[in-house]
Swiss-Prot record:
InterPro entries the UniProt entry points to: GAF-like_dom_sf, HrcA, HrcA_C, WH-like_DNA-bd_sf, WH_DNA-bd_sf, WHTH_transcript_rep_HrcA_IDD
Gene Ontology BP terms: negative regulation of DNA-templated transcription
Keywords: Repressor, Stress response, Transcription, Transcription regulation
Family: Belongs to the HrcA family.
NCBIfam families listed in its UniProt record: hrcA
The keyword Transcription regulation belongs to this UniProt entry's keyword annotation: yes
Gene: hrcA
Protein name: Heat-inducible transcription repressor HrcA
Source organism per UniProt: Synechococcus elongatus (strain ATCC 33912 / PCC 7942 / FACHB-805) (Anacystis nidulans R2)
Length: 353
């Protein structure tokens, strides 16, 4: 239904009904709306408008004697056409992410876990963040260190400050190198590789101009190239088959989860192999904005009484992972959308820097 088919008064009353139910989890009547939301019209006028909204499928009465609550259609129209994200909470989310994960000098898992914890804490809902899909790490720093007369340690640090190393054995013809000569050659090789590989993946090895090093370094270069290729095979990108989940306790405090059977179904979904949740979170990677799916729009029975708010975080403008919140359909959508948007934006910047 288009919001243009509603009068301004009906839009205001629908918005007030949604806000009331989100806040209280209780149906609301016309008298309460008139008294609590300053609508400047009589309870009778509000009652008539609520009747119109009910006939339009936007509100319903859970019990004959009760007030009204929003339907899924009412939430959908509210989210799509009446709601504005809470920009103050968006700024607060950005600030907490920047302050609590200040220099980003941590592993990728620590970065994502910290972001998931902050998102859950600020929203009060269940946060879920996937690991990046097919993300190739980039070289941040490379160093060669002589640790014995015949052995060199190759150390590579990636853009998530994770470290891998390989022990290289010098060929027979180099065993008589004096320590200072070997150190000089290792420094030249380290400088060459940092210049050529910094900010690039190890796959860029195939395009390196090794002959430019000169004949003096070619024997070392061959050993080094093999060591780097071995590291590349060992250091594969993290697949997006891992899901970080935070905030379950907060979600289960919501009155919608007071039935043991429903809680058990949700726990089984979260504790399983995640093969059901991941496709849902990673669907439609072309989307460049926050997506809200409500109730029956979700195909999984354990969360069919919930809403899923999700957005992609990107690298080089390509979606690589998902940031999501799961909460009851009676969700504070203004907050959820703002917090998810801020977190996805932060992660995009973090993995790009």
């Amino acid at each position: 239904m288009l919001v243009s088919r509603l009068t301004a008064r009906q839009q205001t009353i629908l918005s007030a009904t949604v806000r009331h139910y989100v806040r209280t989890a209780e149906p609301v009547g016309s008298k309460a709306l008139a008294e609590q939301y300053g609508l400047s019209v009589s309870a009778a006028t509000i009652r008539n408008a609520m009747g119109v909204l009910e006939r339009a499928g936007l509100l319903y009465q859970p019990h004959t004697s009760a007030g009204r609550v929003p339907s899924e259609g009412g939430y959908r129209l509210y989210v799509d056409q009446l709601m504005e994200p809470d920009r103050a909470l968006q700024r607060q989310t950005e600030q907490q992410l920047s302050q609590q994960l200040p220099d980003r000098r941590q592993s990728l898992e620590a970065l994502l876990r910290g972001a998931a914890q902050i998102l859950a804490s600020l929203s009060g809902y269940l946060s879920l963040i996937t690991f990046p899909l097919g993300l190739e790490f980039q070289v941040r720093h490379l160093q060669l260190v002589a640790i014995a007369p015949h052995q060199v340690l190759l150390i590579v640090v990636n853009d998530s400050y994770e470290t891998q190393s390989a022990l290289l054995t010098l060929p027979e013809l180099d065993r008589d190198l004096e320590a200072d000569q070997l150190d000089r050659q290792l420094l030249l090789l380290s400088n060459f590789l940092n210049q050529e590989l910094q900010g690039r993946s190890l796959q860029a090895l195939a395009n390196l101009d090794w002959p430019v090093l000169g004949s003096e370094l070619q024997s070392l270069a061959g050993i080094l190239q093999q060591g780097l290729q071995d590291l590349e095979k060992r250091w594969q990108p993290t697949p997006a088959t891992s899901l970080l989940v935070c905030g379950l306790a907060d979600l289960l405090r919501q009155p919608e989860f007071n039935e043991l059977q429903q809680v058990q179904a949700l726990l089984e979904l979260l504790e399983g192999e995640q093969t059901q949740l991941l496709p849902l979170m990673l669907a439609d990677p072309a989307a460049d904005q926050v997506r809200v799916r409500i109730g029956s729009e979700l195909p999984l029975a354990p969360i069919r009484s919930c809403s899923l708010v999700s957005a992609f975080y990107c690298r080089e403008q390509q979606p690589v992972g998902s940031v999501s919140l799961i909460g009851p359909t009676r969700m504070l959508y203004e907050n959820a959308v703002a917090a998810v948007e801020a977190t996805a934006s932060y992660l995009s910047e973090a993995i790009a820097s």
